Amino acid sequence: SGPLKCVYFDLEHTLNEEWARMLGVNLEENFYLVSPDAQSAEELLDLIVDMVSSEEVGLVVLDSICYLEPMAELNESLEKKSYGGISKLLSSFFRKVTPYLHKFTASLLIINQLRDSMDLYKLYDTPGGRALKHACSVRIMFKKGELYNEKFEAIKKSSELAFGNQVLVKIEKSKISKPDRIVGFYKLSYYSGIEKESELADFMLKFGLITQAGSWFTFIDPESGEILDGFKAQGMPKVVELLKNNPELFNLYTTYINNNMIK
């Protein structure tokens, strides 16, 4: 049977392959990029159903939902177009594709966007209607956080020397974990992608796996609670550097936190 394929529907025609590789995406093996030109929403959604039901595709990414255009709107001029007709179509699509997703343990990842809400009680809403929200097993909101420099220090939003930014993450809906909670954040470097070691250092500090005295950080053995000899750093950048240069240390704390702290 072999490895399952990943199919990425780039409806916005904005996928940056260099940036994708930096984030760890392997574009050379079992990755298929689809950049449709004038296909209707009906054609694209039927294609997704066919792909998932083929048992050869393990992940489909749809980027993004608001660029789907029903056939009736595709053939009309801009003057005659009436928007909002995608919700009913999505309802039918999810009834078709969901059984195949479960049967073949495939995943459908749909990227959406925030829109200003007309509802006085809601600051924002997302395109796709209720059918999309109801069908999803998990809905996650990503939001840009504060900027930081190469020392992982917060800087002003007006700064032109940003090294990266925090990405805030919130679970909007989940059938597999607790909903409506702030999961936390991770750091995104504009030069190297997701800063896994910096994220781990933040978790270690939060859970007491490193202790701070002034500018010095001491590593704690997660099993014994004793000071870990030979690992001490001055400043958070040095902590991150230690984790990058010592894979066994990175794996030790990552495994412990995933198994014992994250619930």
Give the role of each language-model region.
Residues 51, 83-207:
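Phosphate-binding/switch region of NTP-binding enzymes
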Residues 203-213, 217:
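PDZ/PDZ-like groove recognition
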Residues 18-19, 120-121, 223:
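Short Asp/Glu-rich motifs
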Residues 73, 116-120, 213-216, 227-228:
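N-terminal cationic and glycine-rich segments that engage phosphates or anionic surfaces
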Residues 5-8, 32-34, 109, 140-142, ...:
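Short hydrophobic alpha-helical runs that function as membrane-insertion/retention elements
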Residues 215-263:
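Terminal-proximal interaction/regulatory segments of ATP-powered molecular machines
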Residues 2-83, 87-92, 96, 256:
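Conserved inter-motif catalytic segment of the P-loop NTP-binding fold
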Residues 32-41, 213-223:
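Short linear loop/turn motifs
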